[in-house]
Every structure is written in C-alpha cells, then in structure tokens.
Amino acid sequence: MSDIKLYGYATSPYVRKTGCFLYYKQLDFEFVPVSPLNAAETLDFIGGTQVPVLVIDGEARRESSEHALWLDERFPERPLCPSGHREKILRLDKWVSDTFLMSIFRGAIDSEPNLQYRYRFWRLAALVSAHTPMPEQIRHLWPDFVAQAPFIKAMGEKMDLTESPADMAMRIGMELAAHIGEGPYIGGLEQPSMLDLAIFPQLVFGVMFGLEERLSAGQHPVIKAWLSRMAEHLPANPTLVADTMQLMSISDALAALD
C-alpha cells in the first residue's frame, strides 16, 4: 500500500481540490495541516510555502491540477482525467483554474472591510486554528492579514475588478451551469472528472462551515441537481476541515432548497 500525505492549509480551495481527488479515488491518505505562521518550516522538505503538496511514497509534487494527472498515473482506477476525454477536460480545467477558483478570492480583494467582512474572516481563522492553533491576537487580526497577503494581491492583479462582485458571481454561476449542461457531469461526461471534483468542495464549503446561511449555488436547478449527484461519490465531509467545526450537512443544505 502506498504512503500518501497531503500537506496544506485547511481552508485552501486548492487543497480541498486535491483532497477530493484522493477521496474520489478511495485512497487512504494522511492530511497534514500546515500553519500559515510556519509553513516554510513544515514544508522545508520541498521548499517554499505554496500548497497543496502531495507526497506519494516519498516523492513530493505541487500544483493541484497536476496532482490529478499524477494520481491517474499511479492509481488508474476511477480516473480523474480519462484518456478519451483528456483534451476537453484540460481545456475546461483552464476555466476552472483561471476563472472559477480565482473568483473565490474576490471577497478578500476589494470588499468593504465592514463587520460582516470581518466576521467571515474571523470564522476562517477559527477553521484554520482548529487544525493549527493560532494566538488569539493573530486570529483577531486575520481579516487584515489576509487582505495584505501577497498571494491575495497577486490574484487581484489577474482579475477584472471593474466587474462588480455580484455580477462576477452571477456570470461564473451561469458559466458553470452551461458547462454542466445536460450532464450528468461537467462537459457532458458520464462520470465525475477532475473538473467536478475541483468545484464541488468549494460550493459546499461555505454552508457547511458557517460562511453562508444557504447553499447559494444550489438555487440554480442545474447546479443543484449536479451537487446532489456529486455528493453520492464523496464522503459526507469532503473538505478536510475538522468535523467538529461543521455546522450543516450537505444533505440538509440541499433539502433546505426544496
């Protein structure tokens, strides 16, 4: 049996993405939480602070989309990027990476720093601290740290910030629904691929862990039906965040939309 470890921040969408690859393939693995306060020390075996880092039998690699291809090489069952659909999947993966996943960081870039904003990032700090405890003062200042992080600023430089956050969210939601189409999975594929597994945990994360009251993406009927299908392929908590921090199940969140 292979020794598999996934290193990352508990709240990183890219870490959740690789985690869902592993869950879908039904591989036993160890999640090693990385503290943002000493990431370089934890990741000294590979250098830098970028996550996720996937280690299989001592070999370490970065880049979540590359993880899908590597996992298929090592563990061909339940493919993430089937050879017959590789070109389509990699083309759509560019949209997932450059548009969908990047948009997750919009709220940290140019949102008004009001109390609602601070509550959101205090909650994220609590989720991080549940795995890698942080001092109370650091948690209190977390909204400010995130807003000033070089990684976040770099994301902002790649976005069209003249488009309002609401318009961006609506546009990307409609694009996702179009990519699902008649389904059953993204791109019209018959089985989930790396595309579905990259997006699903991001859409359910907020409602599961207290960042939104309702599963907002599920208000679109195409996306809601797709979420229900995807949930059948993954554990009840596919996010890597501790179960003790969960406030709502995916099944309850979907039922609340009926």
Which positions does each model-derived feature cover?
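Generic alpha-helical structural signal
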Residues: 65, 90, 170-174, 224, ...
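Long, positively charged, glycine-interspersed low-complexity recognition regions
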Residues: 200-258
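GST-like domain detector, emphasizing the conserved glutathione-binding G-site
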Residues: 1-135, 254-255
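GST-like fold's C-terminal all-alpha helical module
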Residues: 102-218, 222
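Alpha-helical scaffold segments in carbohydrate-active enzymes
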Residues: 91, 95-98, 175, 201-205, ...
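Short alpha-helical hairpin
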Residues: 44, 141-152, 248-257
